[in-house]
Amino acid sequence: MDREPLSSGRLHCSARYKHKRSASSSSAGTTSSGHKDRRSDYDYCGSRRHQRSSSRRRSRSRSSSESPPPEPRHRSGRSSRDRERMHKSREHPQASRCIGVFGLNTNTSQHKVRELFNKYGPIERIQMVIDAQTQRSRGFCFIYFEKLSDARAAKDSCSGIEVDGRRIRVDFSITQRAHTPTPGVYLGRQPRGKAPRSFSPRRGRRVYHDRSASPYDNYRDRYDYRNDRYDRNLRRSPSRNRYTRNRSYSRSRSPQLRRTSSRY
């Protein structure tokens, strides 16, 4: 009578233990399957990302291979096409009412130029290019006609003729705007470490070079400037003066030391 409830109790405990193991195994299976699913999803997404990045790289490489290489630029910043276009415009300028007369004699006056070109049509104005320093003609001028046909006729008729012993060249002007007078002096940026021609670094004054001066005078000026610069360096550097003072002091004391040593 007593053994029956014990067997039934043992059976109940074993059933509960089996139920727990089955539940734990099922949960472990779900977690493992969940991990597997996550890994598979990650692998799928990673492969898709890899495919996208590789396709982007291919498209970039194709676009870079298809695009032409950049044009080499000149020191002035202009490309080769711009320089070719400018060269062509200089060789074959467009027809305009302004013509340029080049190769003139520096003694040819504006009045003579007007008499020469006035027979082809009414002239609006003549601009002689004058040197600012010498106040003389630089050998070319610009003539503005009122009509384009008159400017074309003057160009075709007067190009190559001889005026005051010089054969002139007539062509259309490259620029369509009014020409500004040239100052006769270089107005660009000066290179580093160099002063303008008319400026002397010594005492900051202007020096006017005389062509009749002898080479000895130039040598003397350079020698004086070198001595002045050496004196300024001596005055500015105290360490060099200290060294010279110590050296003179040692020279003055050296004979006395020798005499005292000889006594003993």
UniProtKB/Swiss-Prot annotation:
Primary gene name: tra2
Residue positions, PTM Phosphoserine: 40, 212, 214, 254
A Pfam family the protein falls into: RRM_1
Composition-biased stretches (Low complexity): 23-33
One GO biological process term: mRNA processing
Protein name per UniProt: Transformer-2 sex-determining protein
Phenotypic consequence of residue 173 to A: In pm3; greatly reduced female-specific DSX splicing. Retains male fertility and temperature-sensitive phenotype
Stretches for region Linker: 176-196
Family assignment from sequence similarity: Belongs to the splicing factor SR family.
Cellular component per GO, a single term: spliceosomal complex
Phosphothreonine, modified sites: 180
Region: Disordered, residue numbers: 1-96, 179-264
Keywords for the protein's UniProt record, in alphabetical order: Developmental protein, Differentiation, mRNA processing, mRNA splicing, Phosphoprotein, RNA-binding, Sexual differentiation, Spermatogenesis
Keyword Cell membrane included in the entry's annotation: no
Lineage start: Eukaryota, Metazoa, Ecdysozoa, Arthropoda, Hexapoda
PANTHER family: TRANSFORMER-2 SEX-DETERMINING PROTEIN-RELATED
Origin superkingdom: Eukaryota
Compositional bias annotation for Basic and acidic residues: 71-85, 207-234
Keyword presence, RNA-binding: yes
Main function: Required for female sex determination in somatic cells and for spermatogenesis in male germ cells. Positive regulator of female-specific splicing and/or polyadenylation of doublesex (dsx) pre-mRNA. Splicing requires an enhancer complex, dsxRE (dsx repeat element: which contains six copies of a 13-nucleotide repeat and a purine-rich enhancer (PRE)). DsxRE is formed through cooperative interactions between tra, tra2 and the sr proteins, and these interactions require both the repeat sequences and PRE. PRE is required for specific binding of tra2 to the dsxRE.
Occurrences of domain RRM (ranges): 97-175
Mutagenesis or variant effect for residue 173 to F: In a15, loss of female-specific DSX splicing and male fertility
Domain notes: The RS2 (Arg/Ser-rich domain 2) and RNP-CS (ribonucleoprotein consensus sequence) domains are required for both male sterility and female-specific dsx splicing but the RS1 domain is dispensable.
